[in-house]
């Protein structure tokens, strides 16, 4: 079972606690939503769970293992994420950005197989981003970038998908479509 859970997690910045004693558990097929006002620490919790921020206290488990005991390569095969921060993607097409989600499955040289490219194309189709896949990622709209970042996480093909404001920058039609796809993926 690929459950993700936290026990007595304390998150914050520069050794200053923001939120303490966070106890979450999400099992396969479940969707958990963190709700709160801007600046309340939702993104900080997600960044800490995904090891983008150092935890101040407590434990994050991926399955039965503490994430402290797992290598980054092990984590990236089991957990994917879409965060609100911008990737540095100089001179990359949308399709190349999505393809980077397959890197945990490639060898040392990062060469994708036909099967990898099929997963990339399937994820792009799922988020309806085919029209921008060949364009420079930095020259498309925020909403188009958001859809491609979701495709990147989907084609990473993990059991756990962590999304920080996944419908940011999207118009209403795409918001509904993305939320439907997220439900289907669960």
Residue ranges and their predicted role:
Residues 110-111, 136-140, 144:
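Conserved ABC ATPase signature
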Residues 50:
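Helix-to-loop junction immediately C-terminal to a conserved catalytic motif
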Residues 161-165:
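Catalytic Walker B motif of ABC-type/P-loop ATPase nucleotide-binding domains
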Residues 4, 19-21:
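Conserved structural motif at the start of ABC-family nucleotide-binding domains
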Residues 58-66, 75:
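Conserved ABC transporter NBD signature motif
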Residues 99, 114-132, 157:
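Conserved ABC ATPase "signature" region
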Residues 35-37:
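The feature captures the beta-strand-to-loop junction immediately N-terminal to the Walker
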């Amino acid at each position: 079972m690929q459950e993700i859970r936290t026990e007595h997690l304390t998150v914050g910045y520069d050794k200053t606690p923001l939120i303490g004693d966070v106890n979450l558990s999400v099992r396969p097929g479940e969707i958990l939503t963190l709700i709160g006002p801007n600046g309340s620490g939702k993104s900080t919790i997600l960044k800490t769970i995904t090891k983008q921020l150092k935890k101040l206290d407590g434990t994050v488990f991926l399955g039965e293992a503490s994430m402290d005991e797992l290598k980054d390569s092990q984590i990236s095969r089991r957990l994917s994420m879409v965060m609100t921060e911008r990737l540095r993607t100089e001179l990359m097409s949308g399709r190349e950005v999505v393809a980077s989600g397959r890197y945990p499955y490639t060898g040392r040289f990062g060469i994708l197989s036909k099967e990898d490219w099929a997963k990339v194309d399937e994820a792009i189709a799922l988020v309806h981003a085919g029209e921008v896949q060949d364009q420079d990622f930095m020259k498309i709209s925020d909403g188009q970038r958001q859809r491609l970042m979701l495709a990147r996480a989907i084609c990473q093909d993990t059991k756990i998908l962590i999304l920080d404001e996944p419908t940011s920058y999207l118009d209403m039609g795409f918001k509904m479509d993305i939320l439907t796809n997220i439900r289907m993926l669960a």
